[in-house]
Amino acid sequence: QLVTNFKSFTKQYGGFLSEFTHGEYRYLANAVEQFFINGGTRCFISRVCPPDAVVAKAKKGSLSVEAANPGKWGNRVQISLSTVTRKKMQLIAKSGEAFIAKSVDGFKEGDTVEFEGEYNRIASIYDRTVSFEGKFKNNPVDESVIAKKVVYLVTVDVSVRYNDEVENYSELSFNMSSPYYIGAKLATSELVKVDVTPDKNMGNPVEAILGKG
């Protein structure tokens, strides 16, 4: 495996080892660090894993996460998720069981939305006609020029941290048809591998993973 700096090495193979646990086999990290300090630019590392080497992993709700590589370093990876409701859609009229939106820009079929604390999912979008999987308890229609009632797109901000290295992903979706699908976006992570199980429940996706509170 090619590494081009010491941070890349520690991310993939871990940091310095203690004499107590590794004895005379503890010097690889020191050697690689000195290699780059002294002007080295390309270092090839071959990992020899013991039979019992494991990958740090965790599963909560619909989200399964594991470290990108085996080793204890993965135990220090931290992931945080937060619900985001920035994009909004104004529904200006009702049409049968569907609604007419002022604009559907940024919204797709399968997206989770929120209106007055109630979660729903977009079933279909045709032109500006939008239908939802569930019924709203309160009427979401607002014909005003400046709307007071709007439907919000529910997305998730994700932060992946390992020591000083941080990967931030903004406004991700659990909708597989979205260009911001969490599974596709986190596939580019150099710290973790993620698997997402489709969730048919309509609710806050972060609460479905982490619980309320």
Residue ranges and their predicted role:
Residues 1-213:
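Surface-exposed assembly/interface segments
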